[in-house]
Amino acid sequence: MIISSPNDYRAAAKSRLPPFLFHYVDGGAYAEYTLRRNVEDLSHIALRQQVLRNVADLSLETELFGQKLTMPVALAPVGLTGMLARRGEVQAAKAAQAKGVPFTLSTVSVCPIEEVQSQCAKPIWFQLYVLKDRGFMRNALERAQAAGINTLIFTVDMPVPGARYRDAHSGMSGRSGPTRRVLQAMVHPRWALDVGLLGKPHDLGNISTYRGKPTNLADYIGWLAANFDPSISWKDLEWIRSFWKGPMIIKGILDPVDARDAVAFGADGIVVSNHGGRQLDGVLSSARALPAIADAVGDDLTVLADSGIRTGLDVVRMLALGAKGVLLGRAFAYALATHGQAGVANLLDLIEKEMRVAMALTGARSIAEITRDSLVGLPR
């Protein structure tokens, strides 16, 4: 299969992965209305083409949370990345660091914190959920700090898990799931060898380290779902803010009031996100929510965005809407599933190339010059 654009990786990943894994990455909540709107709303935003602006010297370099980056992009936390490619979190982290952008390790990664960070010269980012088991949360934070990680993404839009109907149809969940997953692996021999056999152990590394015993996919579905905490409030997070000395980013903000609450809480940044359309179907796309949130917080904290970003053009659109940087989730997951570390590296190169073309044709010579003036109208 020819890979000439970031979107080509989706079809390639669908061919390579067993259905239960592809649809786990690809799917959303309920009827997947928000999943579709995330992509569609971004694609409908018109950039303002401006010519004769002397764009011979373009720079995508930026700084986020004290880190100098080659472009305002980070890899988002994606659970079970180590099931998409052999020790997938390590491969993705290496590709990101080679490109000069951050990789974010999910709470529910296959590879534990220590394994991933030991393979990277610079600190990765770490993502944590709000869970009933505060002991696990403290253990994860302590281990992250001990490994040298200083940037925390705290996901707050999962007090309860979303209803992802595709998982039942694909074999990811349901009583017949284990049998169906084995049968699917048998007809995907490349994945079965690379990941199923050579990618062991298939633990949820961060959870099994804490529990002191191996974990499996049933634990991902069972233990994690049982530990989401619907009673959480801003006050419950104060101990984390006092414990974590580095930058703390709140992920899952869709409302300006919540964004202002994050400022009052003392967050260093927020991620405007609807969890990639995987939680509450029917909410605003991130592209529609972003402008009002960016206006509400101004320079009081750093605004990032995710959900629906598939291309370099999408990155430029999000920056013009008010984000200082973006997180790539599905886009890198598809690339990782297709060609491992090399796939993620190539994806990031494609994203950069598309950003450079978009900036040149809108007259922006630096990231700072990508503003609302780079757009023709705002999404309604």
Swiss-Prot record:
Its cofactor is FMN. It comes from the Bacteria. Keywords: Cell inner membrane, Cell membrane, Flavoprotein, FMN, Membrane, Oxidoreductase. CDD domains: alpha_hydroxyacid_oxid_FMN (cd02809). InterPro entries: Aldolase_TIM, Alpha-hydoxy_acid_DH_FMN, FMN-dep_DH, FMN_HAD, FMN_hydac_DH_AS, LldD. One of its GO terms (cellular component) is plasma membrane. FMN binds at residues 106, 127, 155, 251, 306-330. It catalyses: (S)-lactate + A = pyruvate + AH2. It is an enzyme of class 1 (oxidoreductase). HAMAP family: L_lact_dehydr. Catalyzes the conversion of L-lactate to pyruvate. Is coupled to the respiratory chain. NCBIfam families: L_lactate_LldD, PRK11197.1. This is L-lactate dehydrogenase. It comes from Azorhizobium caulinodans (strain ATCC 43989 / DSM 5975 / JCM 20966 / LMG 6465 / NBRC 14845 / NCIMB 13405 / ORS 571). The gene is lldD.
